[in-house]
Regions:
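Short, Lys/Arg-rich N-terminal segment immediately upstream of the first membrane anchor
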Residues: 1-6
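Electrostatic cytochrome c docking/interface patches
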Residues: 29-55
Length: 136
């Protein structure tokens, strides 16, 4: 039985919607990759390795971070939008050096705060900073 014009029109519309969805998904992936590259350039670190460190160091035990399932803690502040904040811990200007320092040795910056010092190299702290910046 031949297809009616209505069926052909519906078929073409469905194909157009699928093509649009694929294009939108591709643009989102490209935007995420661009954000990660920009974050790595700013922080001088490797965001992919920073994501591994985020899990290994147990950051999600105290903090939440959208898109990271193991980040469900309620002790520390949410880490969404760290790259958009003006200050770190309400005391330090938000720049890669200060964020990396805060990650490594928060007790030196604000003695007695709830965040423990995290033994790691300066490069590892830059990698973790790049990961946080890459999340927005």
């Amino acid at each position: 039985m031949p297809w009616s014009r209505t069926r052909v029109s519906i078929f073409i519309a469905v194909l157009a919607l699928i093509a649009a969805a694929i294009a939108i998904y591709g643009n989102q992936q490209g935007a995420r990759q661009e954000l990660q590259q920009r974050a790595e350039a700013i922080a001088g670190g490797n965001a992919t390795h920073g994501q591994v460190l985020f899990a290994e160091k147990g950051c999600g035990g105290c903090h939440t971070l959208k898109g990271v399932t193991q980040a469900a803690g309620l002790v520390g502040p949410p880490l969404d939008g760290v790259g958009q904040r003006a200050m770190i811990a309400g005391m330090l200007a938000n720049n890669p050096d200060n964020l990396a320092r805060w990650i490594r040795e928060p007790q030196t910056v604000v003695p007695g705060n709830a965040m423990p010092n995290l033994p790691m190299s300066k490069q590892d702290s830059r990698d973790l900073a790049a990961f946080l910046y890459s999340k927005g």
